[in-house]
Amino acid sequence: MNFDCIPREDLHGILCHMPKAELHIHIEGSLEPELIFELATRNRIQLPYPTIDELRAAYAFTDLQSFLDIYYAGASVLQKEADFFDMAWAYLKRAKAENVVHAEIFFDPQTHTARGIPFETVINGLDRAIRRGREELGLSASLILCFLRHLSEEDAFAALEDALPFRDKFIGVGLDSSERGNPPEKFTRVFARCRELGLRLVAHAGEEGSAEYISHSLDLLKAERIDHGVHCLDDPKLVARLVQQRIPLTVCPLSNVKLCVFPSLSAHNIGKLLAAGIAATINSDDPAYFGGYLNRNYTATFAALPGLGAKEAYQLARNSFEASFVNENIKEGWIRELDEFFTHYRENEGKWLPL
């Protein structure tokens, strides 16, 4: 496909309107301050911030741990099934408006069960929103259960046991929270059990952790997809492996800058990842906290990196479909939609028009 006819000034519209998938979104991280206050009022929870603006002002993170502290505090307003539904439904509506056609959504059950919230309350609310999204929005979505790596292996096994009666409502498991002091090998046995159960496997690695964490996630956890993974470029052998085996990375540019993984978007390595042949994707991570949903991650990144153009936009969107955990026929259908989107652009003589 020839992308030379697409001028840079048209990129913003193309990035916002092209069909795409989101593969790295923590649903608790989509909890906007307005909804936090609404749920706090509904559930009679006293927040430490008297106004929405003061809560927003508290989103001044210096590293991953300082973010996680307020992230878990915000999740405390989630008490009932309706709360989890409302949170997920708000995200799905936003995703639909941004031309996301498929989302694979992380959720952290241990954050909630530790507060005495039953697992079924969490997953039933999320699942109800996903089913409504399919019916009313035509948006495909699925759930991935994430284990909190700062907790013990025993806690992870307990979370898995809680989840098994609801096995039909999630497609896989992941590993999130702080990498420091919590290497992948801590959860080797948990992931082995999940693999036996036929669950899809992903893991956060190489965000604040080293390239070795990525290798260990692949070798020990048998992860099929790496979340973040930006430190892979520190290891040329790992890069070659990622390219050869087509192991996708779910990269989150605005998150990386907010958490000081990179000093600025102009210093981000997403362009280098693509140039190396890695199946990188762009995602929002925790959009309510990091200043942008999926389209903002695309547009801000492309604005900051002049080397990225229409070819990279197409490749990132295509990678997002190819890296998703759906059957090949569905993937091929989405890729045809993407091809038609760019073909439609060319047929209109270089003028961007929506399909």
Swiss-Prot record:
Cystine residue pairs: none
Residues holding Zn(2+): 24, 26, 204, 285
The enzyme's E.C. designation: 3.5.4.2
Catalytic activity, as annotated: adenine + H2O + H(+) = hypoxanthine + NH4(+)
GO MF entry, a single one: adenine deaminase activity
Chain segments annotated as coiled-coil in the UniProt record: none
NCBIfam families: aden_deam (TIGR01430), PRK09358.1-6 (NF006850)
Name under which the protein is recorded: Adenine deaminase
Organism expressing this protein natively: Geotalea uraniireducens (strain Rf4)
Lineage: Bacteria, Pseudomonadati, Thermodesulfobacteriota, Desulfuromonadia, Geobacterales
